[in-house]
Amino acid sequence: MRRVLITGFEPFGGERINPSWEVVKQMNDLMMGGVRIVARQLPCAFGEALTALNTAIDDVQPVLVLAIGQAGGRADITIERVAINVDDARIPDNLGNQPVDQPIIQEGPAAYFTRLPIKAMVQGIREAGIPASVSQTAGTYVCNHVMYGLLHRLNQFNNEVKGGFIHIPYLPEQAVDHPGAPSMSAQSVLVALELAISIALQIEHDLHITGGPVH
């Protein structure tokens, strides 16, 4: 049976919950068109997150890996285009580490592009009435760290496996502690992630449509 690995993070930065795990854990053991979804939680910690991710990939042997993370302040489901080879942490991770201008992989390439049909995914999610867009930066915190490490692994050892990263907004119960911050319901995020998986499994060549910002 084919499997999809989807990951979410533990809470960080003083939050009580992390929306990525709150939604992703609901997808564990879900069957979609003969494909089994396996959900795993990652620690919000440099190095440790990649160790946990690589262990999960070894255990699950997925055909697709989707890493999901919180992007408080964003209003859309944002599908990341690129990961860069640098850790530059504005705040410490959950183990107290705060790397500044450190490469994720020594002698690794400057960046990796996603292995997902991101524009087709955005289009499909929007057609379901859920805000979505292509993002040009995954930041330089643990989310980018995981995306870069994932794509490095897939490019080096699992070239047939698709993979990438999706950022999601705060849940409403988080946004009440951040006046003015946008949020999205867990149900809408769940629908968006199910669509993302379905489209990623079906589409081999991405749509040739615009998705970039002006600035």
UniProtKB/Swiss-Prot annotation:
It is an enzyme of class 3 (hydrolase). The keyword Cytoplasm applies. InterPro entries: Peptidase_C15 (IPR000816), Peptidase_C15-like (IPR016125), Peptidase_C15-like_sf (IPR036440), PGP-I_bact-type (IPR029762), PGPEP1_Cys_AS (IPR033694), PGPEP1_Glu_AS (IPR033693). Its main location: cytoplasm. GO terms for cellular component: cytosol. Keywords: Cytoplasm, Hydrolase, Protease, Thiol protease. One of its GO terms (molecular function) is pyroglutamyl-peptidase activity. Removes 5-oxoproline from various penultimate amino acid residues except L-proline. Homotetramer. This is Pyrrolidone-carboxylate peptidase.
